């Protein structure tokens, strides 16, 4: 799923959005409307907690969990609209703020991750660190990609 957005975006002719309705309902609705109106292939990738995630707070708190996922940097909200490039604008819109919540606390809020800590604490700590670094690197890469797509003056189509 993490490569899916970038792969679709790289083709240059696919509308693609990554959403989480609990984190930002307006962004989700905007993405759905844009995808529907796009005259070409559209792809919406949605973060949706399920019972297998083992939310410690309970499934009735899944909307809150989506916010945590975005705020921690586990899931980024973004849209890529090829029409914007044709209009001389940046086609990549990042709709989530820079992560500002504890990433590992987010992971530990789900049994699917927290159970590893009980079985092998040292290995879990290493994997949590790697996952957090990967999330930070993904966000930095996303910012770099957005910056690289900024239209250059005088080059608008």
Enumerate the predicted regions with their spans.
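Short catalytic-loop micro-motif centered on adjacent basic/acidic residues
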Residues: 15-20
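Glycine/aspartate-rich loop-and-adjacent alpha/beta segment that forms the canonical ThDP
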Residues: 30-126, 130, 143-144, 157
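Short, amphipathic C-terminal "tail helix"
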Residues: 133-157
């Amino acid at each position: 799923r993490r490569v899916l957005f970038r792969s679709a975006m790289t083709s240059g002719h696919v509308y693609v959005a990554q959403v989480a309705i609990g984190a930002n309902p307006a962004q989700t609705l905007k993405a759905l409307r844009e995808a529907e109106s796009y005259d070409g292939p559209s792809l919406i990738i949605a973060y949706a907690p399920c019972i297998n995630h083992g939310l410690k707070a309970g499934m009735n708190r899944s909307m809150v969990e989506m916010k945590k996922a975005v705020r921690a940097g586990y899931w980024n909200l973004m849209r890529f609209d090829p029409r914007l490039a044709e209009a001389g604008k940046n086609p990549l819109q990042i709709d989530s703020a820079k992560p500002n919540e504890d990433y590992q606390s987010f992971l530990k809020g789900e049994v699917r991750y927290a159970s590893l800590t009980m079985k092998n604490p040292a290995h879990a700590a290493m994997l949590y660190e790697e996952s957090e670094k990967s999330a930070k690197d993904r966000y930095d890469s996303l910012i770099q990609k957005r910056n690289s797509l900024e239209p250059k003056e005088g080059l608008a189509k």
